Amino acid sequence: MILLDGKKTAQDIKNEITAEVNKMKANGEKVPHLAALIVGSDGASLTYVGSKVKACELVGFESTLVKMPSTTSETELLKKIKELNQNDDIDGFIVQLPLPEQIDTQKVLMTIDPSKDVDGFHPENFGKMALDMTTFIPATPFGILELLERYGVETKGKHTVVIGRSHIVGRPMSILMGRKGFPGNSTVTLTHSYTKNIAQITTQADIIISALGVPNYLKAEMVKDGAVIIDVGITRVPDETNEKGYVITGDVDFENVSKKASHITPVPGGVGPMTIAMLLKNTLLAREQRKVNN
Protein backbone atom coordinates (compact mmCIF):
# COMPACT_ATOMS: atom_id res chain seq x y z
CA MET A 1 0.00 0.00 0.00
CA ILE A 2 1.30 3.43 -0.99
CA LEU A 3 0.31 6.37 1.20
CA LEU A 4 -0.62 9.41 -0.89
CA ASP A 5 1.11 11.93 1.35
CA GLY A 6 -0.68 15.23 0.83
CA LYS A 7 1.34 17.01 3.49
CA LYS A 8 4.67 16.27 1.80
CA THR A 9 3.33 16.88 -1.72
CA ALA A 10 1.76 20.18 -0.67
CA GLN A 11 5.10 21.29 0.77
CA ASP A 12 6.82 20.40 -2.52
CA ILE A 13 4.28 22.57 -4.38
CA LYS A 14 4.74 25.44 -1.91
CA ASN A 15 8.51 25.23 -2.42
CA GLU A 16 7.99 25.46 -6.20
CA ILE A 17 5.70 28.48 -5.74
CA THR A 18 8.22 30.14 -3.40
CA ALA A 19 10.90 29.75 -6.09
CA GLU A 20 8.60 31.45 -8.63
CA VAL A 21 7.86 34.30 -6.21
CA ASN A 22 11.58 34.77 -5.56
CA LYS A 23 12.12 35.13 -9.33
CA MET A 24 9.38 37.77 -9.43
CA LYS A 25 11.02 39.68 -6.60
CA ALA A 26 14.43 39.46 -8.27
CA ASN A 27 12.92 40.92 -11.45
CA GLY A 28 11.23 43.72 -9.51
CA GLU A 29 7.78 42.35 -10.32
CA LYS A 30 4.68 42.53 -8.14
CA VAL A 31 4.15 39.36 -6.08
CA PRO A 32 0.73 37.63 -5.98
CA HIS A 33 -1.82 39.06 -3.56
CA LEU A 34 -4.64 36.89 -2.17
CA ALA A 35 -7.53 38.30 -0.15
CA ALA A 36 -9.81 36.18 2.03
CA LEU A 37 -13.24 37.39 3.08
CA ILE A 38 -15.02 35.81 6.03
CA VAL A 39 -18.46 36.64 7.42
CA GLY A 40 -19.08 35.71 11.06
CA SER A 41 -16.93 34.03 13.69
CA ASP A 42 -17.32 30.30 13.07
CA GLY A 43 -14.31 28.67 14.75
CA ALA A 44 -13.54 26.13 12.04
CA SER A 45 -13.85 28.73 9.27
CA LEU A 46 -11.61 31.21 11.11
CA THR A 47 -8.98 28.51 11.62
CA TYR A 48 -9.13 27.51 7.96
CA VAL A 49 -8.92 31.08 6.69
CA GLY A 50 -6.05 31.72 9.10
CA SER A 51 -4.14 28.77 7.66
CA LYS A 52 -4.65 30.15 4.13
CA VAL A 53 -3.30 33.57 5.15
CA LYS A 54 -0.31 31.97 6.87
CA ALA A 55 0.39 29.84 3.79
CA CYS A 56 0.46 33.03 1.68
CA GLU A 57 3.07 34.58 3.94
CA LEU A 58 5.24 31.45 3.86
CA VAL A 59 5.48 31.43 0.05
CA GLY A 60 6.04 35.20 -0.16
CA PHE A 61 2.57 36.30 -1.29
CA GLU A 62 0.84 39.38 0.01
CA SER A 63 -2.39 38.58 1.84
CA THR A 64 -5.38 40.49 3.14
CA LEU A 65 -7.97 39.13 5.57
CA VAL A 66 -11.34 40.89 5.51
CA LYS A 67 -13.58 40.05 8.49
CA MET A 68 -17.24 41.03 8.52
CA PRO A 69 -19.74 40.40 11.35
CA SER A 70 -22.33 37.61 11.14
CA THR A 71 -25.04 40.30 10.98
CA THR A 72 -23.68 41.56 7.64
CA SER A 73 -26.43 42.01 5.07
CA GLU A 74 -26.26 40.59 1.57
CA THR A 75 -26.09 44.14 0.15
CA GLU A 76 -23.09 44.99 2.37
CA LEU A 77 -21.27 41.80 1.39
CA LEU A 78 -21.88 42.30 -2.34
CA LYS A 79 -20.57 45.87 -2.03
CA LYS A 80 -17.37 44.58 -0.39
CA ILE A 81 -16.94 41.96 -3.12
CA LYS A 82 -17.29 44.62 -5.81
CA GLU A 83 -14.59 46.65 -4.04
CA LEU A 84 -12.26 43.63 -4.16
CA ASN A 85 -13.14 43.11 -7.84
CA GLN A 86 -12.04 46.67 -8.60
CA ASN A 87 -8.91 46.65 -6.45
CA ASP A 88 -6.04 46.24 -8.93
CA ASP A 89 -3.62 45.33 -6.15
CA ILE A 90 -5.51 42.10 -5.41
CA ASP A 91 -4.98 39.24 -7.88
CA GLY A 92 -7.47 36.79 -6.44
CA PHE A 93 -9.82 36.40 -3.51
CA ILE A 94 -11.99 33.85 -1.80
CA VAL A 95 -15.21 34.12 0.17
CA GLN A 96 -15.15 31.57 2.98
CA LEU A 97 -18.20 29.30 2.98
CA PRO A 98 -20.67 28.66 4.53
CA LEU A 99 -22.26 32.10 4.71
CA PRO A 100 -24.95 33.22 7.20
CA GLU A 101 -28.51 32.29 6.22
CA GLN A 102 -29.51 35.86 5.30
CA ILE A 103 -27.04 35.79 2.40
CA ASP A 104 -27.66 34.07 -0.96
CA THR A 105 -24.45 32.11 -1.59
CA GLN A 106 -25.14 31.73 -5.31
CA LYS A 107 -25.56 35.48 -5.73
CA VAL A 108 -22.26 36.03 -3.91
CA LEU A 109 -20.39 33.57 -6.13
CA MET A 110 -21.92 35.18 -9.24
CA THR A 111 -20.67 38.61 -8.13
CA ILE A 112 -17.00 37.60 -7.89
CA ASP A 113 -14.93 38.66 -10.92
CA PRO A 114 -14.18 35.35 -12.73
CA SER A 115 -10.58 36.49 -13.32
CA LYS A 116 -10.12 36.74 -9.52
CA ASP A 117 -12.17 33.65 -8.62
CA VAL A 118 -9.28 31.50 -7.40
CA ASP A 119 -11.73 29.09 -5.72
CA GLY A 120 -13.09 28.26 -9.19
CA PHE A 121 -16.73 28.46 -8.08
CA HIS A 122 -18.03 31.11 -10.51
CA PRO A 123 -20.34 29.56 -13.15
CA GLU A 124 -18.11 30.96 -15.92
CA ASN A 125 -15.06 29.14 -14.54
CA PHE A 126 -17.06 26.00 -13.78
CA GLY A 127 -18.36 25.99 -17.35
CA LYS A 128 -14.86 26.44 -18.77
CA MET A 129 -13.67 23.53 -16.63
CA ALA A 130 -16.51 21.36 -17.98
CA LEU A 131 -15.50 22.31 -21.54
CA ASP A 132 -11.82 21.52 -20.80
CA MET A 133 -10.77 25.14 -21.27
CA THR A 134 -8.01 26.84 -19.29
CA THR A 135 -9.48 28.18 -16.06
CA PHE A 136 -9.26 28.03 -12.27
CA ILE A 137 -10.05 24.51 -11.07
CA PRO A 138 -11.63 24.32 -7.60
CA ALA A 139 -8.77 23.83 -5.15
CA THR A 140 -9.76 20.46 -3.65
CA PRO A 141 -10.34 18.66 -6.99
CA PHE A 142 -7.19 20.37 -8.32
CA GLY A 143 -5.27 18.98 -5.35
CA ILE A 144 -6.60 15.46 -5.93
CA LEU A 145 -5.55 15.61 -9.59
CA GLU A 146 -2.09 16.78 -8.55
CA LEU A 147 -1.73 13.92 -6.05
CA LEU A 148 -2.76 11.34 -8.66
CA GLU A 149 -0.37 12.84 -11.19
CA ARG A 150 2.65 13.15 -8.91
CA TYR A 151 2.24 9.60 -7.61
CA GLY A 152 1.74 8.28 -11.15
CA VAL A 153 -1.64 6.68 -10.42
CA GLU A 154 -3.07 5.31 -13.67
CA THR A 155 -6.54 6.70 -14.43
CA LYS A 156 -6.97 5.89 -18.14
CA GLY A 157 -9.72 3.33 -18.69
CA LYS A 158 -10.26 2.95 -14.96
CA HIS A 159 -13.65 3.01 -13.24
CA THR A 160 -13.80 5.96 -10.85
CA VAL A 161 -16.62 6.21 -8.32
CA VAL A 162 -17.20 9.63 -6.77
CA ILE A 163 -19.26 9.65 -3.58
CA GLY A 164 -20.98 13.02 -3.05
CA ARG A 165 -22.17 15.57 -5.62
CA SER A 166 -21.35 18.97 -4.11
CA HIS A 167 -20.28 21.75 -6.48
CA ILE A 168 -17.11 22.10 -4.38
CA VAL A 169 -15.75 18.55 -4.77
CA GLY A 170 -17.99 15.77 -6.07
CA ARG A 171 -19.41 17.29 -9.23
CA PRO A 172 -16.18 18.92 -10.48
CA MET A 173 -14.27 15.74 -9.63
CA SER A 174 -16.62 13.65 -11.78
CA ILE A 175 -16.09 16.04 -14.70
CA LEU A 176 -12.30 16.17 -14.32
CA MET A 177 -11.82 12.41 -14.05
CA GLY A 178 -13.78 11.92 -17.27
CA ARG A 179 -11.92 14.52 -19.31
CA LYS A 180 -9.27 13.75 -21.92
CA GLY A 181 -5.70 13.66 -20.63
CA PHE A 182 -3.94 12.64 -17.43
CA PRO A 183 -5.30 12.40 -14.82
CA GLY A 184 -8.54 11.60 -16.63
CA ASN A 185 -9.88 9.32 -19.38
CA SER A 186 -11.69 7.47 -16.63
CA THR A 187 -15.21 6.01 -16.69
CA VAL A 188 -17.01 7.87 -13.93
CA THR A 189 -19.95 6.99 -11.70
CA LEU A 190 -21.25 9.83 -9.53
CA THR A 191 -23.11 8.58 -6.46
CA HIS A 192 -25.07 10.45 -3.81
CA SER A 193 -27.61 10.04 -1.02
CA TYR A 194 -30.26 8.67 -3.41
CA THR A 195 -27.98 6.07 -4.98
CA LYS A 196 -29.25 2.55 -4.31
CA ASN A 197 -26.97 -0.37 -3.40
CA ILE A 198 -23.90 1.86 -3.30
CA ALA A 199 -21.64 -0.98 -2.10
CA GLN A 200 -22.35 -2.86 -5.33
CA ILE A 201 -20.99 0.14 -7.21
CA THR A 202 -17.96 0.87 -5.01
CA THR A 203 -16.79 -2.76 -5.09
CA GLN A 204 -16.46 -2.38 -8.89
CA ALA A 205 -14.38 0.78 -8.59
CA ASP A 206 -10.68 1.06 -9.41
CA ILE A 207 -10.62 4.53 -7.86
CA ILE A 208 -12.93 5.82 -5.12
CA ILE A 209 -13.14 9.51 -4.25
CA SER A 210 -15.28 9.99 -1.14
CA ALA A 211 -16.52 13.49 -0.34
CA LEU A 212 -19.51 12.71 1.84
CA GLY A 213 -18.56 14.05 5.27
CA VAL A 214 -19.74 10.93 7.10
CA PRO A 215 -17.04 9.52 9.44
CA ASN A 216 -15.83 6.00 8.60
CA TYR A 217 -18.55 5.57 5.97
CA LEU A 218 -16.45 3.59 3.50
CA LYS A 219 -15.80 0.13 4.96
CA ALA A 220 -13.37 -2.54 3.77
CA GLU A 221 -16.20 -4.71 2.42
CA MET A 222 -17.18 -1.83 0.07
CA VAL A 223 -13.75 -1.80 -1.58
CA LYS A 224 -12.05 -4.25 -3.93
CA ASP A 225 -8.43 -5.31 -3.53
CA GLY A 226 -5.99 -2.87 -5.13
CA ALA A 227 -8.36 0.09 -5.30
CA VAL A 228 -7.10 3.67 -5.06
CA ILE A 229 -8.84 5.53 -2.22
CA ILE A 230 -9.08 9.32 -1.98
CA ASP A 231 -10.67 10.49 1.29
CA VAL A 232 -11.96 14.06 1.14
CA GLY A 233 -14.02 13.84 4.33
CA ILE A 234 -13.01 15.98 7.29
CA THR A 235 -15.29 15.66 10.31
CA ARG A 236 -14.64 16.63 13.92
CA VAL A 237 -15.63 13.63 16.03
CA PRO A 238 -15.88 14.21 19.82
CA ASP A 239 -13.13 12.38 21.71
CA GLU A 240 -12.63 13.01 25.42
CA THR A 241 -9.24 11.26 25.38
CA ASN A 242 -7.89 13.91 23.00
CA GLU A 243 -6.69 17.21 24.49
CA LYS A 244 -8.65 19.14 21.82
CA GLY A 245 -11.79 17.23 22.72
CA TYR A 246 -12.16 15.87 19.20
CA VAL A 247 -10.35 13.97 16.45
CA ILE A 248 -10.40 14.75 12.73
CA THR A 249 -11.92 11.76 10.96
CA GLY A 250 -12.33 11.01 7.27
CA ASP A 251 -15.03 9.20 5.30
CA VAL A 252 -12.88 6.08 5.11
CA ASP A 253 -12.34 3.39 7.75
CA PHE A 254 -8.61 3.86 7.20
CA GLU A 255 -7.35 1.04 9.44
CA ASN A 256 -9.24 -1.66 7.54
CA VAL A 257 -9.54 -0.17 4.05
CA SER A 258 -5.79 0.54 3.88
CA LYS A 259 -5.16 -3.22 4.08
CA LYS A 260 -6.91 -3.68 0.73
CA ALA A 261 -6.00 -0.44 -1.08
CA SER A 262 -3.07 0.02 -3.47
CA HIS A 263 -2.99 3.77 -2.70
CA ILE A 264 -4.80 5.75 -0.01
CA THR A 265 -4.84 9.28 1.41
CA PRO A 266 -4.69 9.73 5.20
CA VAL A 267 -6.91 12.07 7.22
CA PRO A 268 -5.49 14.42 8.31
CA GLY A 269 -2.47 14.96 6.03
CA GLY A 270 -4.02 13.90 2.72
CA VAL A 271 -6.34 16.05 0.65
CA GLY A 272 -6.56 18.93 3.17
CA PRO A 273 -3.01 20.31 2.76
CA MET A 274 -3.32 19.92 -1.02
CA THR A 275 -6.38 22.18 -1.08
CA ILE A 276 -4.44 25.10 0.39
CA ALA A 277 -1.43 24.47 -1.88
CA MET A 278 -3.62 24.54 -4.99
CA LEU A 279 -5.36 27.72 -3.84
CA LEU A 280 -1.88 29.27 -3.80
CA LYS A 281 -1.18 27.84 -7.25
CA ASN A 282 -4.43 29.34 -8.58
CA THR A 283 -3.44 32.71 -7.09
CA LEU A 284 -0.06 32.51 -8.83
CA LEU A 285 -1.88 31.73 -12.10
CA ALA A 286 -4.18 34.72 -11.51
CA ARG A 287 -1.16 37.03 -11.06
CA GLU A 288 0.45 35.69 -14.25
CA GLN A 289 -2.79 36.14 -16.23
CA ARG A 290 -3.25 39.70 -14.96
CA LYS A 291 0.36 40.46 -15.93
CA VAL A 292 -0.31 39.25 -19.49
CA ASN A 293 -3.65 41.07 -19.76
CA ASN A 294 -2.23 44.34 -18.44
Swiss-Prot record:
UniProt keyword list: Amino-acid biosynthesis, Histidine biosynthesis, Hydrolase, Methionine biosynthesis, Multifunctional enzyme, NADP, One-carbon metabolism, Oxidoreductase, Purine biosynthesis
Pfam families the record matches: THF_DHG_CYH, THF_DHG_CYH_C
Pathway(s) per entry: One-carbon metabolism; tetrahydrofolate interconversion
Binding site for NADP(+): G164, R165, S166, S193, I234
Gene Ontology molecular function: methenyltetrahydrofolate cyclohydrolase activity; methylenetetrahydrofolate dehydrogenase (NADP+) activity
EC number(s) given by UniProt: 1.5.1.5, 3.5.4.9
UniProt superkingdom: Bacteria
GO terms for biological process, alphabetical: L-histidine biosynthetic process; methionine biosynthetic process; purine nucleotide biosynthetic process; tetrahydrofolate interconversion
UniProt keyword Cell membrane, yes or no: no
Reactions listed under catalytic activity: (6R)-5,10-methylene-5,6,7,8-tetrahydrofolate + NADP(+) = (6R)-5,10-methenyltetrahydrofolate + NADPH; (6R)-5,10-methenyltetrahydrofolate + H2O = (6R)-10-formyltetrahydrofolate + H(+)
InterPro entries: Aminoacid_DH-like_N_sf, NAD(P)-bd_dom_sf, THF_DH/CycHdrlase, THF_DH/CycHdrlase_cat_dom, THF_DH/CycHdrlase_CS, THF_DH/CycHdrlase_NAD-bd_dom
Gene Ontology CC terms: cytosol
Similarity annotation: Belongs to the tetrahydrofolate dehydrogenase/cyclohydrolase family.
Self-association and partners: Homodimer.
Function per UniProt: Catalyzes the oxidation of 5,10-methylenetetrahydrofolate to 5,10-methenyltetrahydrofolate and then the hydrolysis of 5,10-methenyltetrahydrofolate to 10-formyltetrahydrofolate.
Name used for this protein in its record: Bifunctional protein FolD
Source organism (scientific name): Flavobacterium psychrophilum (strain ATCC 49511 / DSM 21280 / CIP 103535 / JIP02/86)
